[in-house]
UniProtKB/Swiss-Prot annotation:
Organism of origin: Caulobacter vibrioides (strain NA1000 / CB15N)
Name of the protein in its database record: UPF0102 protein CCNA_00142
Source organism, top-level taxon: Bacteria
GO molecular function: nucleic acid binding
Any single Pfam family the record assigns to this protein: UPF0102
Family label: Belongs to the UPF0102 family.
């Protein structure tokens, strides 16, 4: 495959990912969450969305695939662990977050379907 084709596919995937994150943020806002950040880089990994509702700090992974089921299956154990470490690091090092209950959520998306939000998606993973 030519380098230009790979690059354009990567660019398209990033656009789809950003759009999915914006839709996920709007979905969470409609459910009463306050969005604290998008694509937050930590030394231990990136967090797609950071949201708060009450005393809960939701660290949200957003996955869009062709089906909701594929999106639900897209986060592998190594990625969950990286997300958990990044969440712990961010909560410990960002002012105002230390006293919140950190929870790892997943928002699964597919074209033509409403987002599916799974609070505590991996049972305290």
């Amino acid at each position: 495959m030519a380098a230009g084709v790979r690059q354009s596919r990567g660019t398209a995937a990033r656009k789809v990912g950003r759009r999915a994150e914006v839709i996920a943020a709007l979905w969470l806002m409609a459910k009463g969450y306050r969005i604290l950040g998008f694509r937050l880089a930590t030394p231990l990994g990136e967090i797609d969305l950071l949201a708060q509702r009450g005393k809960v700090l939701a660290v949200v992974e957003v996955k869009q695939r062709t089906t909701i089921e594929d999106a639900l299956d897209a986060v592998k154990p190594t990625q969950r662990e990286r997300l958990r470490r990044a969440a712990t690091h961010l909560a410990a090092h960002r002012a105002g977050l230390r006293d919140l209950l950190v929870r790892l959520d997943l928002i699964a998306m597919a074209p033509g379907r409403p987002p599916r939000h799974l609070p505590d998606a991996w049972g305290g993973a």
